[in-house]
């Protein structure tokens, strides 16, 4: 299906020159003079090569038909990440470059949305928030409760983030998967 370039967003799949590309980033640029353009960074699905394209915002781009389904994360091995369709129990192997940096937030039995073109996984969407445990952080300093500054912490998945001063080692916190930022203390 053809769409205008300015409507392309991160995660969309574009068909160009007979090959499929996943959009890594898309930005509409409106210079003071001249025609507005869409700067689109894409990753070729077949071999992972990244390219950058610039289109006029009114140019037509071929958007590939993608099917999104819920899958359950099972495990990781040297070949990639393995997911299961909870309805049919079919298993799908997703290459490591498709999962990318989101791999740190994958947890066993987590439900994720896999975008598939034919039978090929092209992108993955994790839940917006995950609950993790703080394994390393500085101790609470008395009198620091009034400041709004965050202190560094290492989470159970190895990711570093900033947490409020009252968070201690062993505390379970909710983290945003998009950027790894602290959201709140877990309520469990």
From Swiss-Prot:
Gene Ontology molecular functions: translation elongation factor activity
Instruction: Cite the CDD domains for this sequence.
Output: S1_EF-P_repeat_1, S1_EF-P_repeat_2
The record's Gene3D superfamilies line, in alphabetical order, gives: 2.30.30.30, Nucleic acid-binding proteins
For this UniProt record, the keywords arranged alphabetically read as follows: Cytoplasm, Elongation factor, Protein biosynthesis
What would be one Gene Ontology cellular-component term for the protein?
cytoplasm
Superkingdom of the source?
A: Bacteria
Name the major location. Answer: cytoplasm
Q: Which pathway does this polypeptide act in?
A: Protein biosynthesis; polypeptide chain elongation
Q: Which InterPro entries match?
A: Elong-fact-P_C (IPR015365), NA-bd_OB-fold (IPR012340), Rib_uL2_dom2 (IPR014722), Transl_elong_fac_P/YeiP (IPR020599), Transl_elong_KOW-like (IPR013185), Transl_elong_P/YeiP_cen (IPR001059), Transl_elong_P/YeiP_CS (IPR013852), Transl_elongation_fac_P (IPR011768)
One of the GO BP terms on file: peptide biosynthetic process
Location comes to: Cytoplasm
One family from Pfam that matches here is EFP_N
Record's function text: Involved in peptide bond synthesis. Stimulates efficient translation and peptide-bond synthesis on native or reconstituted 70S ribosomes in vitro. Probably functions indirectly by altering the affinity of the ribosome for aminoacyl-tRNA, thus increasing their reactivity as acceptors for peptidyl transferase.
Family in the record: Belongs to the elongation factor P family.
Could you tell me which HAMAP family the record lists for this protein? EF_P (MF_00141)
Xref: PANTHER family: ELONGATION FACTOR P, TRANSLATION ELONGATION FACTOR KOW-LIKE DOMAIN-CONTAINING PROTEIN
Under which name does UniProt file this protein?
Answer: Elongation factor P
- Species this protein is from: Bradyrhizobium sp. (strain ORS 278)
Gene name for this UniProt entry: efp
